[in-house]
Design a protein with these regions (language model features):
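N-terminal binding-site loop/beta-alpha segment at the start of enzyme catalytic domains
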Residues: 1-83
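Acidic-and-aromatic substrate-binding clefts and catalytic sites of carbohydrate-active enzymes
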Residues: 60-69, 92-93, 131-135, 183-187
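Acidic (Asp/Glu)-rich catalytic clusters
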Residues: 73-84, 114-118, 168-172
Length: 314
């Protein structure tokens, strides 16, 4: 699989990145720690991803309250291979525990992440959220210090809006921004993508299927499937439950059928066609869910085709 460099660094990531946020939990939500994929299921997914040429894995200290990093570390040790590793910090690892991007906390959290992963350094370390209590000078200084002592190779930010990213850029330039972006979530088109282009920052979106909405999983006047994002964490997607969205999704499914691909493949193809997208983070719940992402690498869209799909969703 093709790899691409991040920002101005020598770190490369595969065009499809394996998101490990469902290993041992559902993202960073404490109420779901211990749920999500079991270790056995996570191993199946990582085996499948590695076998398909996905060589970059994305996790975070708070995913599953540390369980995700632990599973990734055990898989690395058992398989004798080392994928490119991205991890993050900000969120608490227990209910009511500390959080944030203070220098001492980041150093402590990185040390524990390295221990769980069983490695001496990670390729990319991300601020998982913006911390209003930490100055840009402190944050950039912390990251640069970790690079200097070879605990990380590059750094970046996640879930930063345009204003937050702009304030950071007055002090330092991250190698990568990792935000939610899809045909149904285009907020980053209002500033973030422009800043990334202007400063040579790579962009690796997560949530390419908008919690399953772009796969056709959710139907009008029908209960949401058990175990789906809308069943477990509906908040980020509740605004999509309207007739306008369903009508656009109907047309999107028709276009996918005409092209002979799964809607998930078309959704990821659209992202890969965007000139500002370096790689796409996908978080499968089962190994077979990797197949639409791999198919998207071969299903290339022209600029006009990508623009037509974007117009479907405003």
């Amino acid at each position: 699989m093709e790899s691409r460099p991040l920002g101005g660094t020598d770190v490369e990531v595969s065009r499809i990145i394996l998101g490990c946020g469902n290993f041992g939990g559902i993202g960073s939500a404490p109420e779901f720690f211990g749920q999500g994929e079991s270790e056995e299921e996570a191993f199946w997914i990582m085996d499948a991803a590695w076998g398909l040429g996905i060589t970059t894995f994305d996790t975070a200290d708070a995913y599953g309250g540390g369980r995700s990093e632990t599973m990734v570390g055990k898989w690395i040790a058992s398989r004798g291979v080392t994928p490119g590793l991205i991890t993050k910090t900000f969120n608490p690892m227990e209910t009511g525990a500390d959080h944030g991007l203070a220098r001492t906390r980041m150093a402590r959290q990185l040390e524990s992440s390295l221990e769980r992963l069983g490695v001496d350094r990670v390729d990319v370390y991300l601020a998982h959220e913006f911390d209003p209590d930490v100055s840009a000078n402190e944050l950039v200084g912390t990251f640069e210090g970790l690079v200097a002592i070879s605990l990380i190779r590059a750094w970046g930010v996640s879930n930063f809006d345009a204003e937050q990213l702009r304030s950071l850029l007055e002090t330092g330039t991250p190698a990568v921004v990792q935000n939610s972006y899809s045909l149904l979530d285009r907020a980053d088109e209002r500033g973030v993508l422009e800043l990334c282009a202007a400063f040579g920052i790579s962009y690796t979106p997560f949530g390419p299927l908008a919690g399953g909405w772009l796969t056709g999983k959710y139907k009008r006047d029908a209960p949401v499937p058990e175990g789906s994002r809308m069943a477990m964490r509906p908040g980020p997607y509740e605004h999509l439950r309207n007739e306008e969205t369903f009508a656009s999704l109907d047309r999107f499914a028709e276009i996918a059928a005409q092209r002979g691909v799964h809607p998930a493949t078309l959704a990821i193809s659209w992202l890969l066609a965007q000139p500002h997208v370096t790689a796409v983070v996908v978080g499968p719940r089962r190994p077979e869910q990797l197949e639409p992402a791999l198919a998207a690498l071969e299903h290339q869209l022209s600029q006009s085709e990508a623009e037509e799909l974007a117009a479907l969703f405003g």
